[in-house]
Each structure stands twice: as C-alpha cells, then as structure tokens.
A protein has these predicted regions:
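Membrane-interfacial loop- and helix-cap regions that link adjacent transmembrane helices
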Residues: 3-10, 36-37, 92-139, 144-167, ...
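Hydrophobic alpha-helical transmembrane segments
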Residues: 63, 176-181, 358-364
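Membrane-interface "cap" regions at the ends of multi-pass membrane proteins
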Residues: 1-62, 66, 83-88, 110-112
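Alpha-helical transmembrane segments and their membrane-interface exit regions
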Residues: 82-85, 174, 197-200, 378-385
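Alpha-helical transmembrane segments of multi-pass membrane proteins, especially transporters
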Residues: 47, 75-80, 265, 345
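Extracellular loop-to-transmembrane helix junctions
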Residues: 61-105, 109
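Central hydrophobic cores of alpha-helical transmembrane segments in multi-pass inner-membrane proteins
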Residues: 55, 80-92, 171-179
Length: 407
C-alpha cells in the first residue's frame, strides 16, 4: 500500500518549477545561469556533497583516536548509509507534501518549502513544532561551529590576532550570506566547496603517508567509554548534513529526481573521509587525543597553508548552507519571505546573524558543541524524526487509528 502511494507521488508534476527553469533559460544571461542560477541534479549533488563534510574533515582523525581504526571505519560506513536512507525518506515526504499542495493549486514560485512545513502539512502542528525546534536549534549551533572553526583554522597561519578577534572578523564576512537569496544561487559555491574539501582531504592523506609514523607512535584505541561515544557522535554529526535536504530539493527544477542523490554524494564523501582520517591516525596515533584539529600535527608548508585557506572559504559556504534555512524561517515569521526585493530580505535577515555571531564570540570552542549537537540534535533532526514521520505518514488505516488514540 505504502509503495503504491510512493510511486504515485514520484510521478507528480512540478509545473511552476519547470516554467521557472524555462524562464531562466530565456531571460537570464549565460554567465548568470553558469555561476548563479542552479537547479539541476548536478547542482543538488554538489550541494549535498559540499555541505556534508566541512570542519569535521579535520576532526575525524581525532575521532579515530577515540574509537580506534576499526570502529572509526565501521561508524563512518554505518552513519553514512543511515544518513542516506533517512535523506531518501525526507525526499519521499517532501514529494508527497508537494504533490498534495499542487493538487490544491498552491503556487510555490515565491515560497521555499521547509521541513517543518512538510511535517505540518502531512502530520499536523505538533510534528511541525517538533521539527521546527530541532531543525532550527541544530542549524543555529551548526552556524556557530563554522564561525568558531574559522578562527581556529586561521590561527595556524596567522597568530598575530587572538581567536576571538578572528571570530569578530569572520562573523562580519559570513554576514554577507544574507545577500544569497536561496539554494538556487549556490551553484558556484557548492562546486568550489567540494573542490576545497577534496584538496584538503587528499593533502591530509598524502602528507601523513609522506611524513610516516611519528617516533614512538601508539594506537591505544578506545580507553574510556565516554571517549568512545564522543568519537561516535562526531561521526554522527559528519553524516547529519541532510538537515537542509528539503531546501536543496526545492531548489531543483525537478525535485522528484533527488531520490538517490544523497547516497551518491555520501559515497563520494567517504572517499575523502576514510583515507584522510585513517592516514592521519596511522601516522600520529594517540597524539591526536590532545590535538583535535589534524592540521596542528602536520608540518607547516605551502600545501598546509593552502588547505587552511581553502577550508576557511569552505566554512563561509557551509555557514551559508546552515544559515539560509534560518533566514527563511525568520522571513516567514515577520512576513517578508515572498517579497521580491533582495535588499529588503537581506536587511530582514540580519537579526538572525547577530545572535550567531555573539554565541561564537562568547563560546570560542567547538569540540564540546560538536559532541552535543551530534548526540542530541542530529539524532532527532535527521534520523529519528524523519523515520518516524515516514512510518506515520504511510501507515495503514488501522495503524493510523492506533496512533491517533495514543496522541
């Protein structure tokens, strides 16, 4: 029964998105379409892959030192596949919601559908409130982490200023993301972001193998249960990037083609995370327990400085990915979401950036935040809630009656 319903949904048409694509081809300049106006399957893949791994690429070797090599590899594979599965469930729910609304003649040309709206339309206000709380809190702290990470990374190549001062500077830089209207406009940034993480991952791999094992290196593995689960939550956070799946899907010309994109993106990301984390842990072993950022152990060189700079730029991109859904929520709350004035929307978004900037300044450490976000917020936001929502949405009639009686 559920599979038949899903098939019907996948066959749905997204007429206004197709009209928008045609309009874009006829009115936008070639440069605008090339660098700014994306909505293809490839754009969605670049967005998913680029957003999935950022600062955590540098902390995964630290997680390996807490977990041990074998557990680190197993957790990456497990959470990667689980994340791909729940991203698929989210895509099915989005398509179901979108199809129902289009049958009611709802026009989404000036409105970005978000996860909490999908839950509201399919399951009601209690699910909406649950999704809104966890998603917004997760994205809020995800944005804070990116600002803190910027200051932490730049310190490796320029320590003339303290980390808090660098947070002031990068907060101002990241505030410019208020001028990026939606995920349609991340085409160039998503592509560059993936190039940057690819370079950094392979630099870490090659530099570690070239360096060889440090003198007296040991690989103790999990010494304490707390450390073991701390390492696991960091990997959980790594593959929990599909909190923005709905927004990425909505930016596609044909969202029904999203189904396998996240899985393919995850497989590519694993080709970056597994070799880099394994190589750095092999080279430095237990030294990583006191060096959460892998770049701090690699010898300084032009290649390392390049990796630092590229990761700084990538964190700007990731900040935009995490913050843009928060911008949308705020725009809808104050009633400016559907306005066509980019300047008005940018001004309206500034109150979202300021508290994030403030939190990054007063909490200049991202390790504990990573663990908290991974263990609680990611678990519910991108694993538990989507799985439960899918089961309830496509439950049989008797099962739905039982659920109603319980709620």
């Amino acid at each position: 029964m559920a599979s038949e319903k899903v098939e019907t949904v996948v066959a749905g048409n997204y007429l206004e998105m197709e009209r928008e694509e045609e309009g874009s081809k006829s009115t936008s300049g070639k440069l605008s379409r090339l660098f700014w106006h994306g909505g293809s399957v490839y754009d969605a893949w670049f967005s998913c892959a680029s957003n999935q791994v950022a600062q955590v690429l540098l902390t995964l070797p630290y997680s390996f030192s807490q977990l041990g090599m074998l557990s680190g590899i197993i957790f990456q594979l497990f959470y990667g596949l689980m994340g791909s599965w729940t991203a698929y469930l989210i895509s099915v729910l989005y398509v179901e919601y979108r199809t129902r609304k289009e049958r009611e003649k709802v026009d989404f040309r000036n409105h970005v559908i978000q996860w909490f709206e999908v839950l509201d339309g399919l399951l009601g206000k209690h699910w909406r409130n649950l999704g809104l709380f966890f998603n917004c809190t997760f994205l809020l702290f995800g944005s804070v982490i990116q600002l803190i990470a910027c200051a932490s990374n730049i310190y490796y190549i320029n320590d003339n200023l303290d980390k808090r001062t660098w947070t002031y500077i990068f907060g101002a830089c990241c505030a410019t993301t208020v001028f990026i209207p939606s995920f349609h406009n991340y085409r160039m940034w998503s592509f560059l972001g993936l190039v940057m993480t690819t370079y950094t991952a392979w630099y870490m791999t090659i530099a570690s193998l070239t360096h060889g094992q440090a003198e007296g290196v040991t690989h103790t593995g999990p010494a304490k249960l707390v450390l073991y689960f701390t390492g696991a939550t960091n990997i959980l956070y790594t593959f929990g990037g599909h909190a923005v799946t709905v927004e990425i899907m909505h930016a596609m010309w044909k969202p029904q083609k999203f189904k396998m994109i996240y899985l393919i993106a995850t497989l590519y990301v694993l080709t970056l995370t597994l070799p880099s984390a394994s190589a750095v842990y092999w080279a430095f072993g237990d030294q990583l327990l006191t060096h959460s950022n892998a770049l701090s152990l690699l010898p300084r060189s032009g290649f390392r400085d390049t990796a630092v700079i590229l990761m700084l730029i990538h964190q700007f991109i990731t900040f935009g990915f995490a913050c843009t859904p928060l911008y949308f929520v705020w725009e809808k709350f104050i009633g400016v979401h559907e306005t066509k004035s980019l300047f008005k929307r940018a001004l309206a978004r500034l109150p979202v950036v300021i508290p994030i900037w403030f939190l990054a300044i007063i909490f200049p450490f991202f390790g504990p935040i990573n663990s908290t976000v991974g263990s609680l917020l990611v678990s519910f936001t991108v694993y538990i809630i989507p799985a439960l929502a899918h089961m309830v949405t496509f439950a049989s009639a008797p099962a739905r009656e039982v659920i109603r009686s319980c709620t």
